[in-house]
């Protein structure tokens, strides 16, 4: 069923290896895993694995500096840079495209349209309400946002009602309201 699933395994020397799978109601599965060298990999729809930084670049965060700014000095991200042969948005996009569609001619336009269709077209990718609920519940969404300010207005997708305005400090009550509403 749609949602996010976690697993922890151990390698030969006892190091913990983490993995998770995001299963949408409709669309491509995303499988994340770490290896014994702390490199963070992703598989899109059960294809060959690529460093997570390739996917991040393909989604528009192109340079190492931008990735570090977003994720901080996370050791698994830094270790992934060593395995990543791409250095910018276009290279990351083409690298991911090669893994998803091996043997097809490489073109930035084709790669962009594939990524947009796979992850940003609601007709082709949908977590569904159950998947979104499970995702938020497992990630403890409502507990983690308490005490933070909202960067933009939060709108209920079913009614169009503004639930909270930008720059609002999130309280426990507001977090619970957002958790229980139809906010994606």
Identify the residue ranges that each predicted region occupies.
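N-terminal non-catalytic structural scaffold regions of very large proteins
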Residues: 1-184
